[in-house]
Regions:
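A polyanion-binding, active-site-adjacent surface
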Residues: 1-170
Length: 170
């Protein structure tokens, strides 16, 4: 299966206990649909399980998870990887790619490439939907198209792996 790994819960995700249910989730669903994928076809999780936020003028604002927070949640993520046994992991954003592909991952330079990893056949990183939503005009359309393409590449890699497995069965 394909496992999508984001950063961590935002406000809505924290309230519902489900990943990607806010605006970023709606964009993710659109990009999945353009690749003929629904949430029924994938697993979705985050590298941290609690909302990482800071207070600003008595308002909570999302922030990237700290290394300590990522490390504290790693056993839970490792257990999910063990149970799901994904063929391909799609990391959304730098924090996810840093945690799962390699530290110091450079999302703009390395997204869209496949990496061999110990917990799946491959991992690939893509831009996070929340980042895409912060772009405007043509920049929004361009980075959204890269997310659609990266999801498509992940989907095709899963299909390729399944076809190779089917050939070895007979």
């Amino acid at each position: 299966p394909l496992l999508i790994v984001g950063e961590g819960p935002g406000e809505r995700e924290d309230l519902t206990g489900r990943p990607f249910v806010g605006r970023a989730g709606a964009l993710l669903d659109e990009c999945l649909a353009e690749n003929r994928i629904t949430r029924k076809h994938v697993y979705i999780t985050n590298i941290v399980k609690c909302r990482a936020c800071s207070s600003e003028n008595s308002r909570k604002r999302n922030r990237p998870p700290s290394t300590a927070e990522t490390n504290a949640c790693r056993p839970y993520l490792d257990r999910q990887l063990e149970i799901i046994r994904p063929r391909v992991v799609l990391c959304l954003g730098s924090p996810s790619a840093n945690a799962l592909i390699h530290t110091n991952f450079r999302i703009m330079q390395e997204r869209g490439r496949f990496f061999e990893v110990p917990f799946a056949d491959y991992a690939i990183a893509a831009l996070h939907p929340a980042y895409i939503l912060r772009q405007g005009g043509q920049a929004f359309r361009d980075v959204r198209a890269t997310l659609v393409a990266d999801i498509g590449a992940a989907r095709l890699k899963v299909v390729e792996i399944r076809k190779a497995e089917a050939k070895t069965l007979f």
